Every structure is written in C-alpha cells, then in structure tokens.
Amino acid sequence: MNPHHYGLILAGGRGTRFWPRSRKRSAKQVLDVAGERSLIQATVARLAPVIPPQRMWILTNEYLRRTIIRQLPEVPQNQVLAEPVPRNTAPAIGLAAHILRSLDPDAVMGVFPSDHVVRKPAVYRTVLRAALKAAAAGNLLVVGIQPRWPETGYGYIEFPRGTKPGAAQALPVRRFHEKPELANAKRYLAAGNFYWNSGMFFWRADVLLDQLRRHLPRTASVLASLPRFGSRRFAGALKQAFPLCENISIDYAVIEKAAHVSGIAAGDFGWNDVGSWNAVYELLPHDACGNVTAPSSICLDAHNNFVDARGKLVALLGVRDLIVVDTPDALLVAARDEAQRVGEIVKALEKRERHDLL
C-alpha cells in the first residue's frame, strides 16, 4: 500500500428518500438497507485492501458522528469529523485536503460517497488503484461508469469518441452533462462515450487546494486560516470559520471550471448509488412472485412488492408494486415507481414541524 494514499468518505447526507428509517440521527449511510452491514461499514471494508482504515477520514455531521465512530472502531476517532453546519461538498473536501496537506505534503486523496453499493469489489479496486496512480501525477480525476440503460437520474461524463470501458489509463474529459431528459439519455447510451458520473474523485491534496484558491477563493482563505489540525484551538476555530464557507458542491465549484480534468472510463463493477427504496428492491433477492420481504411474510396474489417491517408478520393480499416500510412511529406505503418522491414526505413533515419524525 502506498503510504501517501488517503480516503475521504462523505457521510453528511440525510437520506430523505429512505424515510421513515432514515432520520437525522440514523441516516441512510448508517443503515443496513442492502445487507448485514451498514452502507458506510461496507464502504470502509471495500476500500481497506487499497487504503487502510488508519488513513481514512470521514466527514459527517454532529447527529451521526457518534454512530459512525461506534460502527467503525477501526477508523481513528479524531479522523471522523463533524461539519459545524452543512456547506455541501466543496468546503468539506477542501477541509480534508487542508488537513491532509498539513500532515503529508505528498498526500493523494480519493473522495468516496458513503452510501453506494459495489457488487464486484475486486474490479472496483483495480479502478481505484489506477485512479490513485493517475492522481499522483497531478491530475484532477473523476470516475465514469459505463451506462447499462438510459438513466435520467445521474449526471454524465463525456469522454472522447471511441472510448472503451475498462481501460486503466486516464482520459481527457470533454464535458460534464447534467441529469438528462430521457431522449438525451438514450442518445448518450447509443453514442458510447458518455459515462455515468460516479461521484468519486481523486487528486493530490495540494492540487485541489490550488484549484480552490483559483475558483473558490473565499472558502480557500477561510480554510487556510485554520490552526493546525490536532491543536487545542482547531475545533473552536473550525466551528467559527466553517459557516463562512460558500455552500456549493465540488462539481460546480471546481470540477466544471477546471481547465483540465481527466477520467477513468470504468467498466461494470456492480455499482449502484442506492438512491431510493426501489433501488434496494432491485438489489435484494426476490421470491417466486417478485416480492422482497421476510421469509415469515404471507403473500397471496401479491407481486413485486418491497416490505421492510422488522419484528412484525406482514401479510400481502392482492397488491403489487408497493413499498412498505414500517418503524415504531411511522409507516410508509408507496408505489414503487414513486420511490424517488419519498423525500417530499420529509419536506411535508418539516412544514408541519414534526421534528419528532425527522
């Protein structure tokens, strides 16, 4: 393992599309929605053969920090940082780069979502090693994943024409595209050189900080003013300074403005961003009628349903394509094809000031 390679796992999201199980203090990334381990535990385990937990850093919030520390005893506690206020991904990544640059001038960092699933980890780690190697040479690097269908829920990375998946070398990125309409998604799929944006980034810490100084100077100045990580003044200074950072994603702040961005056009490593309960349904094994539910459930003339109701017997009769998620204080019943809208329920609860259900 290269001692200059570090991992930053972003774990501050609320996962509102996974209500009612996902709450402020038990968000999607710390839930076991797609297996026996939580999503963040699976992420750390997947990275560990390339980046050991001792060199992993986690950015989260005050609500989740203790839970993450409890779930990941292998990660040093002082490397699980809580943002004082949410400021999107650019300040969070900039903060980690600032700390890593101060600890290791040659630090190369990979930035990873905490809540994705990878079904082919060996293939994934091959991509990871290639990305870290390319980033060490000074590249800003993204990972694109070969699309398997015309997805409208992902952004796309446009590579040069003729790009083939699975190559280990870094390629120039021609352009980034926002989440498309279906017609454009079909065109991207047919073209063959448009890849899903995985949300994974790789760069030297000093290269990223230089880009922040160019494109986000206020945030760069705020971060540069912080005392050395580990000093007595660091926590208090961070609490005062971090709210002064711009609220902006790393994509808009740096990646889409940088003069040169490279990418790896990855093949299929079984990636899924697990963006909704329906995505969980697609991931888990089904019974003969297409249902995902506990073995004790009773399903009569019921097809293609997803049920998460732990500790209760569930009986389904004459229904299809439903999502049912039960918790002690809330019950969700939704059509599977409306799963992306579950976050609207959270907004409705916020308007009603039902903080007990958030």
Map each language-model feature to its residues.
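Left-handed beta-helix
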Residues: 1-4, 205-358
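Generic secondary-structure signature for well-ordered alpha-helical cores
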Residues: 35, 45, 49-52, 73, ...
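A short acidic, often aromatic-flanked loop/helix-cap motif at beta-alpha or helix-coil junctions
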Residues: 86-91, 149-151, 182-184, 271
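Residue-level signal for inorganic ion chemistry
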Residues: 40, 96, 115, 157, ...
